[in-house]
Amino acid sequence: MTRLKPSVCIDSVFEGQSFRHACKTVRQAGISAIEFWGWWDKDLDALQDAQQENDLVISACCTKFISLVNPADRSAYIDGVAASIEAAHRLGTDILISQVGDVREDVPRAAQHDSLVEGLREVAPLLEQANITLVIEPLNERVNHPGYYLVRSDEAFQIIDEVNSDFIKVIFDIYHQQISEGDLIENIRSNIDKIGHFHAAGNPGRHELQNGEIAYPFVFDQIRATRFTGYVGLEYWPLEKEAMMALREVAGWFVE
């Protein structure tokens, strides 16, 4: 067994609340890492002050949301990754989360797949030089993201094989993949070398991990058994106004 670590997505768990409150609550719950979506729409000075006051690390943040499936957006995507690498260095994180864009209805799917692979190959040298891993994110289209291109994990893992870079992997969102395909444990076990980060939320509803059909303590035990040592980002919207109790309980699931 190896150390699997929790991280709290402050954009969802503490939506509309201050960085200071979010970071203090995370630390008091016994968790030592946070993550968030966009770095470009935040007061990074205030965020880092709250993070450092509470002795937290930043496990991940996002790249700019620019399509990879449209070659016309390639230059903007590369520029966005370059800017996100600079932000990641400032924030001390080595994981960047990338969405891939929506389906182009007028273009064959194979061409969109190829564009995605080509774009990732172009940014791979930037990531390698910076020692930062970019993780592409499959999302469910049935409930939360209608029209999104990358839905199934098998295509995501195929893309990683085709790109063939140690610095480009998949973020496996357990909530999204439960909706899209199920078979969570086998898909994780068989592809753990291609996974760089996890996300988790209860299903249905995308609320606390304690609520729903996914047996998270068991899932986390199975991830530990693969010797994965990265983070599981807790990315959910709480049903309860006070986040502390649920976070503290989940933190206990990571104690070995």
Please report, for each region that a protein language model flagged, where it lies by residue.
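Metal-dependent catalytic neighborhoods of phosphoester/phosphodiester hydrolases
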Residues: L44-Q48, D73-R74, P108-A111, E242-A246
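Active-site acidic/histidine proton-transfer and metal-coordination neighborhood
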Residues: W40, E53, N70-K169, I179
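Conserved beta-strand positions in the central sheet of alpha/beta enzyme cores
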Residues: E35, A60-C62, I97, V135, ...
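Active-site-proximal loop/turn and secondary-structure-junction residues that shape catalytic pockets
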Residues: S12-F14, G38-W40, K64-S67, G101-R104, ...
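Short acidic, glycine/proline-enriched helix-loop-strand junctions
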Residues: D43-C61, I132
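Histidine-acidic metal/acid-base catalytic patches
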Residues: M1-G30, G92-D94, L150-F172, H176-E256
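N-terminal substrate-binding region of glycoside hydrolase catalytic domains
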Residues: C23-G38, A50, C62-I66
